[in-house]
């Protein structure tokens, strides 16, 4: 249902007032909602409330939606009248990309339509408390929120159906058993998860996606905790593998390291996430392509299909534990293309030091067995006396793509490499700035940033 001009003007006029309050507005919203609806503490990441990550993310999303609402409404008006609308999609790509990321995150924690009503009521109450008591403006925001909620609810149902429908799929959570737990180093543990029901299959993930792990232990923490961990195994129908970095302040990471062992059971949501390597053979179509509503389907159709671009170079850049989704991509490429690959593939990893660098042996094994042309480059922020240049590391210091001449030669030769990168916020900012400085086109830059700040690209 289209929004009226009065509604759009009222929302546009007050967007700046909300933005001016900064995270104080969204912090007040969360405090109100989580006080009056304590059951939602089982869903929201309370650590992100304390660090203000979630309030910051909500503020950015809310203001961006308000400022784009006119163009979004125009698109849906045209769709409703069966008039050409796809021309509007390019300028709204940022909005729909963020909406897709939010929808995936919501499905991973099991958000249901009724919960949108709770959120909407507290959002309007916060606007009334802190921005305006004007009934017309509040009514306008109510309609605008309902418009957005309907869009997300529809998309989330499509995503639920996509992961539930195929063989091995499910909705909400399913019980898995820890088949193997391996301590990789002093801060990283690796878990292989299989269905608790022996012999059951799992839906194949897209390389780059994550699992949500649901943890409840009243002796250690009051509320259920949900965290997303990238899948590091290649897509298969038998198991998932994740790696967990033990964060000193991390409730769930410490719990998984210290209290979960081989044979223990965990509740797990299906694979989700909008950051993945798209690889469709000729004539192949995924459930996502057929079930997505047209505007999201259009965005997916614009994603690069690496099965069709057989010679497109791929550069995988990771910081710390950020290598896990890229490991899934690398393993997938090794399976799909292997020694016959016609594309240059780079594995560039940055770690603090050699003691916490993980999965070196696995990357070396992939290169030896399947991808002999794989170029592996390692940056260590701190080099120890026992580290050997050329074996334990290639460059000392923080990541600097200018120190890798092969990349410059690829770019100069118009090979147009695709860059996938994942890591902590500071690392991600540095890599993105370096790629922009090298004039890498937007459609060649693909990233996922830890935490709720930025959408995958």
UniProtKB/Swiss-Prot annotation:
Signal sequence segment: none
Catalysed conversion reaction: 2 nitric oxide + NADPH + 2 O2 = 2 nitrate + NADP(+) + H(+); 2 nitric oxide + NADH + 2 O2 = 2 nitrate + NAD(+) + H(+)
Binding site for FAD: 210, 227-230, 449-452
UniProt region (Reductase), positions on chain: 168-456
PANTHER family named among the record's database cross-references: FLAVOHEMOPROTEIN
Domain notes: Consists of two distinct domains; an N-terminal heme-containing oxygen-binding domain and a C-terminal reductase domain with binding sites for FAD and NAD(P)H.
Name used for this protein in its record: Flavohemoprotein-2
Gene for this chain: hmpA-2
């Amino acid at each position: 249902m289209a929004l009226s001009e009065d509604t759009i003007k009222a929302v546009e006029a007050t967007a700046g007032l909300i933005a001016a309050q900064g995270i104080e507005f969204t912090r007040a919203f969360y405090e109100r909602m989580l006080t009056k609806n304590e059951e939602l503490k089982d869903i929201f990441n309370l650590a992100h409330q304390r660090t203000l990550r979630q309030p910051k993310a909500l503020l950015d999303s809310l203001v961006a939606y308000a400022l784009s609402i006119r163009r979004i409404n125009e698109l849906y008006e045209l769709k409703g009248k069966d008039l050409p609308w796809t021309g509007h999609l390019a300028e709204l790509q940022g909005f729909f990309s963020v909406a897709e990321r939010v929808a995936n995150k919501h499905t991973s924690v099991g958000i249901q339509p009724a919960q949108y009503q709770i959120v909407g009521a507290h959002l309007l109450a916060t606007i009334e408390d802190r921005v305006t008591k004007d009934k017309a403006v509040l009514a306008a925001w109510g309609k605008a929120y309902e418009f957005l909620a309907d869009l997300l609810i529809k998309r989330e149902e499509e995503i639920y159906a996509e992961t539930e429908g195929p063989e091995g799929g499910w909705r909400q959570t399913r019980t898995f058993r820890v088949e193997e737990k391996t301590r990789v180093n002093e801060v990283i543990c690796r878990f292989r998860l299989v269905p608790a029901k022996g012999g059951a299959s799992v839906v194949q993930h897209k390389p780059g996606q994550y699992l949500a792990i649901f943890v409840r232990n009243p002796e250690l923490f009051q509320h259920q905790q949900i965290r997303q961990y990238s899948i590091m195994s290649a897509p298969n129908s038998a198991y998932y593998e994740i790696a967990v970095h033990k964060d000193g302040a991390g409730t769930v990471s410490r719990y998984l390291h210290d209290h979960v062992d081989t044979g223990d059971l965990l509740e797990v949501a299906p694979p989700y996430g909008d950051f993945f390597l798209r690889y469709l053979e000729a004539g192949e179509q995924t459930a996502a392509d057929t079930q997505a509503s047209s505007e999201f389907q259009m965005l997916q159709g614009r994603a690069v299909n690496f099965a069709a671009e057989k010679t497109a170079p791929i550069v995988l850049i990771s910081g710390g534990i950020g290598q896990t989704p890229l490991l899934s991509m690398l393993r997938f490429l090794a399976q799909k293309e292997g020694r016959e690959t016609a594309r240059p593939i780079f594995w560039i990893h940055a770690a603090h030091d050699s003691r916490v660098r993980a999965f070196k042996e696995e990357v070396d094994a992939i290169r030896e067995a399947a991808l002999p042309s794989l170029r592996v480059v390692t940056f260590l922020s701190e080099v120890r006396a026992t580290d050997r240049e050329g074996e334990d590391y290639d460059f000392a210091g923080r990541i600097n793509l200018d120190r890798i001449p092969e990349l410059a030669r690829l770019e100069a030769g118009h090979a147009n490499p695709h860059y996938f990168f994942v890591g902590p916020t500071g690392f991600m900012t540095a890599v993105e700035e370096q790629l922009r400085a090298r004039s890498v086109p937007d459609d060649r830059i693909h990233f996922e940033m830890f935490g709720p700040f930025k959408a995958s690209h």
